[in-house]
């Protein structure tokens, strides 16, 4: 399974759990926000945003020279 499929399964599971336990939507958002997956997604998003901001501010970096071919 790819990451998108797992994310959809996670959200559907959280919706079902939240619906069974309570009818308040705020508690569901708290659970999602505090979950490990959400923390990983936020940190990945922050890193991508920082990289993008650095590229915009500093201009595109020159690409490193291609590595020499490996001998077999």
UniProtKB/Swiss-Prot annotation:
Propeptide residues according to the Swiss-Prot or TrEMBL record: 70-72
Tissue: Expressed by the venom gland.
Cellular component terms (Gene Ontology): extracellular region
Domain of life assignment: Eukaryota
Location of the protein in the cell: Secreted
Coiled coil: none
Region forming the signal peptide: 1-22
BP GO annotations: defense response to bacterium; defense response to fungus; killing of cells of another organism; regulation of blood pressure
Keywords: Antibiotic, Antimicrobial, Cleavage on pair of basic residues, Fungicide, Hypotensive agent, Metalloenzyme inhibitor, Metalloprotease inhibitor, Protease inhibitor, Secreted, Signal, Toxin
Gene Ontology terms for molecular function: peptidase inhibitor activity; toxin activity
Functional summary from the UniProt entry: Amphipathic peptide that shows bradykinin potentiating activity and antimicrobial activities against bacteria and fungi. Has higher antibacterial activities against Gram-negative than against Gram-positive bacteria. Also inhibits NADPH oxidase-dependent superoxide production (IC(50) is 0.4 uM on granulocytes stimulated with PMA, IC(50) is 0.51 uM on HL-60 cells undifferentiated and IC(50) is 0.53 uM on HL-60 cells treated with DMSO). The C-terminal peptide shows a higher bradykinin potentiating activity than the complete peptide.
Entry's family note: Belongs to the non-disulfide-bridged peptide (NDBP) superfamily. Long chain multifunctional peptide (group 2) family.
Miscellaneous comment: Shows a very weak hemolytic activity (6 uM causes only 3.5 % of hemolysis). Shows a alpha-helical structure.
Name of the molecule in the record: Bradykinin-potentiating peptide BmKbpp
């Amino acid at each position: 399974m790819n990451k998108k499929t797992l994310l959809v399964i996670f959200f559907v599971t959280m919706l079902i759990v939240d619906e069974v336990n309570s009818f308040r939507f705020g508690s569901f958002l708290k659970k999602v926000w505090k979950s490990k997956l959400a923390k990983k997604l936020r940190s990945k998003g922050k890193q991508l945003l920082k990289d993008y901001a650095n590229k915009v501010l500093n201009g595109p970096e020159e690409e490193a020279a291609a590595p020499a071919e490996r001998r077999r």
